[in-house]
């Protein structure tokens, strides 16, 4: 109900809210068996993510791709907590905010990620969602956030070098 009220809409059109089923961890985990792709997007805490993976892993089908939308935690470290059978179907998928308007998505493979799974995910992101995809290494903050930090530091340096206030 809240999504339909947001301006601008986080969805392509407001009627798309009808495609979303509200669910919770206590009663609806079995619904995950019907999903082709599960994207985890909770707070950037390794312990919370690991706990969530332990809860959802038993409910995923043998073909479900699972991805973390982390913006900087190690994808390999996250993968290490998953059952071995799931690891080839796990990767990082970093959308930028707001995802409806931001074109770029980073795919971050793990040591165990299946190349065919990553290729299929990239095809889906480009053809169905219209995203531009960059493959990133499992390095701190991946590609775009590293560039962003360097850019912010450069602005701060030049602002100080020219004697400007940061509000000018």
Map each language-model feature to its residues.
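Beta1-alpha1 glycine-rich phosphate/pyrophosphate-binding loop at the start
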Residues: 1
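A short alpha-helix-loop-beta-strand transition element characteristic
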Residues: 12-15, 116-117, 165-166
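Rossmann-fold dinucleotide-binding core
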Residues: 65-146
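Generic secondary-structure signature for well-ordered alpha-helical cores
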Residues: 4, 8, 61, 123-131, ...
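Helical "substrate-binding/catalytic lid" subdomain
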Residues: 126, 139-168
């Amino acid at each position: 109900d809240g999504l339909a009220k947001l301006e601008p809409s986080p969805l392509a059109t407001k009627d798309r809210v009808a495609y979303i089923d509200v669910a919770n961890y206590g009663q609806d985990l079995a619904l995950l068996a019907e999903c082709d792709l599960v994207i985890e997007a909770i707070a950037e805490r390794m312990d919370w993510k690991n706990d969530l993976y332990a809860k959802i892993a038993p409910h995923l089908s043998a073909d479900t791709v699972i991805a973390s939308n982390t913006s900087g935690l190690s994808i390999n470290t996250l993968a290490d907590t998953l059952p071995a059978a799931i690891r080839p179907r796990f990767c990082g998928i970093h959308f930028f905010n707001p995802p409806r308007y931001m074109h770029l998505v980073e795919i971050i493979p793990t040591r165990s990620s299946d190349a065919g799974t990553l290729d299929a995910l990239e095809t889906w992101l480009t053809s169905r969602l219209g995203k531009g995809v960059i493959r990133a290494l499992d390095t701190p903050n991946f590609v775009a956030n590293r560039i962003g930090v360097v850019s912010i530091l450069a602005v701060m340096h030049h602002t100080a070098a020219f004697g400007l206030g940061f509000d000018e």
